[in-house]
């Protein structure tokens, strides 16, 4: 299969020749996706502060410590904060990290496999996505209300991704965490979020998505009847994207961009 548009060709027609020009092409790809699909995220805050609200040192049958942490940081409209859970396995050395964007608060299931992750020697940070901003059309809720919205402003995928990066900001200050080995994870629209987060934030070595579909890992040019199309994603979740994205409804096979560009942007530099 020939993927369109060409991954290693700039918008002006020039070809990527080496690692240095790939860096330039990668930034061009991110700007295309910001402009056409996910919107532009604000710059990261200068600092992120964290407060441990509670701590259970005998979680997961005594194999881990569970901490409830609240982080806070400055935004365009003042201070914003949200909580997350941190599971730390018993270890004398720094451990790799999973940051999970989760639909269900504090419900351990196949989407929130805390004990399996701990038993394999990883730390797990769990963000309930509604604590960042609600999964609704309300653009004044939570983080979405802390920035003015314009044509190319972020949708909620960008906001949830921003929240995951701020959690990583804080966790990189913790000596228990191996900051060289961090992954961001999500399912469905949070799978889209995990991919967009990993593409923008090079500190995440891995981006792991499950069933991310249209607007995630699905290649639009190859879709057939019965696949999730842009129109389906916009019908159910218009607030997840920038205001430009709906203009591509019905044009999945004609996109001047596609999701292989997103996946390539996650590749190590």
Residue ranges and their predicted role:
Residues 177-188:
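Alpha/beta-hydrolase fold nucleophile elbow
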Residues 1-81:
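N-terminal targeting or regulatory segments adjacent to alpha/beta-hydrolase or S9 domains
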Residues 78-82, 88-97:
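Proline/glycine-enriched tight loop/beta-turn segments at coil->beta junctions
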Residues 265-269:
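Short, proline-enriched alpha-helix->beta-strand connector loops that line the catalytic pocket
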């Amino acid at each position: 299969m020939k993927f369109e548009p060409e991954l290693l060709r700039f918008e002006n027609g020039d070809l990527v020749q080496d690692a240095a020009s790939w860096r330039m092409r990668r930034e061009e790809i991110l700007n295309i996706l910001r402009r056409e699909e996910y919107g532009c995220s604000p710059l990261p805050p200068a600092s992120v502060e964290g407060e441990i609200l509670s701590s259970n040192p005998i979680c997961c049958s005594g194999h881990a410590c569970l901490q409830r942490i609240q982080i806070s940081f400055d935004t365009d409209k003042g201070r914003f904060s949200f909580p997350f859970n941190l599971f730390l396995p018993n270890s004398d050395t720094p451990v790799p990290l999973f940051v999970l964007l989760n639909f269900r608060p504090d419900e351990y299931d196949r989407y929130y496999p805390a004990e399996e992750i701990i038993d394999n020697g990883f730390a797990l940070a769990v963000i309930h996505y509604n604590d960042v901003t609600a999964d609704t059309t309300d653009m004044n809720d939570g983080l979405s209300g802390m920035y003015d919205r314009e044509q190319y402003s972020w949708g909620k995928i960008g906001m949830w991704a921003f929240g995951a990066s701020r959690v990583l900001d804080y966790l990189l200050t913790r000596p228990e965490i191996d900051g060289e080995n961090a992954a961001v994870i999500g399912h469905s629209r949070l799978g889209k979020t995990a991919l967009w987060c990993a593409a923008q934030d090079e500190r995440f070595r891995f981006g792991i998505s499950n069933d991310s579909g249209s607007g995630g890992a699905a290649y639009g040019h190859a879709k057939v009847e019965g696949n999730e199309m842009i129109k389906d994603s916009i019908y159910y979740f218009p607030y997840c994207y920038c205001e430009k994205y709906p203009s591509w409804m019905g044009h999945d096979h004609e996109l001047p961009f596609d999701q292989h560009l997103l996946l390539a942007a996650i590749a190590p530099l």
